[in-house]
């Protein structure tokens, strides 16, 4: 019997990994359709049902969804990683969106093609942006009993832990160095049996 859900993304962690973590946590069967990014990609891309030309995409019962955070929110509901009321979900969504804000700022530095411009971006990122976010995150985690929101494990925690390898790859350093709250979340998430089982079987990729 075919899996009820199909996730299509590149064969890396990045924006596909949060969905994989959340579905794995919920023991939700899904097809992990990994696309190799190589010289064949330009010919492969037109064959994929990409609503806006980007991945990941998520398929279910003949329907197709895009946008990684929207997919995460849907998957989190299925996996019961959401809050108990609308306000709690607002706090969880805000935490995940803020993590994504940081991801985009790191990406703007990492993917800069002009070496001189990239060097100009390095100082502000490492000396201002990262310390600002890490300090805020640490206070937030302390306030929420070791989690990002509502004092318990939610999809925001899985979102961070699943992105960490990719963030570290782009930075060339461990984002959790000197940040015990962030490190603790990563360790707790990776110790979850369902997540550990997924990590043990997933393909080895550069990031």
Model-predicted segments: where are they?
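GST-like domain detector, emphasizing the conserved glutathione-binding G-site
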Residues: 1-124, 128-132, 143, 152, ...
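GST superfamily/GST-like fold recognition
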Residues: 92, 148-173, 177, 181-185, ...
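Hydrophobic alpha-helical bundle segments that form small-molecule/ligand-binding pockets
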Residues: 138-149
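Generic preference for well-ordered alpha-helical elements
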Residues: 16, 89, 134, 179-182, ...
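Short acidic/histidine-centered micro-motifs embedded in hydrophobic/aromatic stretches
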Residues: 95-98, 109, 161, 201-205
């Amino acid at each position: 019997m075919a899996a009820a859900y199909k996730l299509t993304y590149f064969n890396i962690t990045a924006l596909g990994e949060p969905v994989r973590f959340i579905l794995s946590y919920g023991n939700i069967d899904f097809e992990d359709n990994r696309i190799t990014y190589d010289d064949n990609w330009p010919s492969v891309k037109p064959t994929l049902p990409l609503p806006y030309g980007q991945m990941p995409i998520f398929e279910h019962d003949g329907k197709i969804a895009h946008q990684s955070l929207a997919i995460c929110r849907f998957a989190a509901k299925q996996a019961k990683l959401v809050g108990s009321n609308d306000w709690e979900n607002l706090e969880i969504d805000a935490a995940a969106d803020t993590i994504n804000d940081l991801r985009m700022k790191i990406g703007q530095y990492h993917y800069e093609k002009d070496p001189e411009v990239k060097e100009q971006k390095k100082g502000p990122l490492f000396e201002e942006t990262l310390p600002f976010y890490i300090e805020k995150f640490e206070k937030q985690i302390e306030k929420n009993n070791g989690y990002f929101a509502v004092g318990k494990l939610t999809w925001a925690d899985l979102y961070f832990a699943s992105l960490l390898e990719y963030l570290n790859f782009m930075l060339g350093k461990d984002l959790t160095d000197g940040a015990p709250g962030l490190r603790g979340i990563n360790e707790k998430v990776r110790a979850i049996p369902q997540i550990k089982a997924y990590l043990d079987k997933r393909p080895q990729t550069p990031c």
